[in-house]
Amino acid sequence: MSLPIYLIGARGCGKTTVGQALALALGYDFCDTDHYLQQARQQTVADIVAIEGWAGFRAREAESLKAVTAASKVIATGGGMVLAEENRLYMREHGRVIYLNANALVLAARLEAYPLADQRPTLTGRPVAEEMVEVLAARDALYQLAAHHIIDAMQTPDAVVNQIVSSLSLARAS
């Protein structure tokens, strides 16, 4: 049985894009926890946050993580999935965790170009570049703590996929 692969990292690091390509390369299924949650609740992330607040959203996010976990699956998680220790431990115990690491300026540029940005409420209400600096400062240590592998996500999606496949192969060989 092949363990699930969890992709973690800040918004805009490429978890969904890389995850879909990685799943294809490995012959795995793909799931995005935010998309799963939105389909299950028939609400956008922004709607869930508006109705239940961030704490309610984080609780639903944790439920989604457990619901989608299965063997031979690549799972793109929400950027804040690592905030709860329960989620970090769950991912480490049930699969391989890959941190897609990118700097704040790259993330901000990607988010500003992303057409569905209105579905992702800002955490601080400030411009996206400022927010990404603050979010990364607060979360980078948590991403590193949760990760089995840290991958440079400032490359092309294909290069990121190749680096992940190599890292996973090296881990299996050791």
From Swiss-Prot:
Binds 1 Mg(2+) ion per subunit. Pathway: Metabolic intermediate biosynthesis; chorismate biosynthesis; chorismate from D-erythrose 4-phosphate and phosphoenolpyruvate: step 5/7. GO terms for molecular function: ATP binding; magnesium ion binding; shikimate kinase activity. The keyword Transcription does not apply. It is an enzyme of class 2 (transferase). Mg(2+) binds at residues 16, 32. Pfam families: SKI (PF01202). It catalyses: shikimate + ATP = 3-phosphoshikimate + ADP + H(+). Its EC number is 2.7.1.71. One of its GO terms (biological process) is amino acid biosynthetic process. Keywords: Amino-acid biosynthesis, Aromatic amino acid biosynthesis, ATP-binding, Cytoplasm, Kinase, Magnesium, Metal-binding, Nucleotide-binding, Transferase. Residues 112-126 are annotated as: LID domain. ATP binds at residues 12-17, 120, 155. It comes from the Bacteria. One of its GO terms (cellular component) is cytosol. The keyword Magnesium applies. It is found in: Cytoplasm. Substrate binds at residues 34, 58, 79, 139. InterPro entries: P-loop_NTPase, Shikimate/glucono_kinase, Shikimate_kinase/TSH1, Shikimate_kinase_2, Shikimate_kinase_CS. Catalyzes the specific phosphorylation of the 3-hydroxyl group of shikimic acid using ATP as a cosubstrate. Monomer. HAMAP family: Shikimate_kinase (MF_00109), Shikimate_kinase_2 (MF_01269). Belongs to the shikimate kinase family. AroL subfamily. This is Shikimate kinase 2. It comes from Erwinia tasmaniensis (strain DSM 17950 / CFBP 7177 / CIP 109463 / NCPPB 4357 / Et1/99).
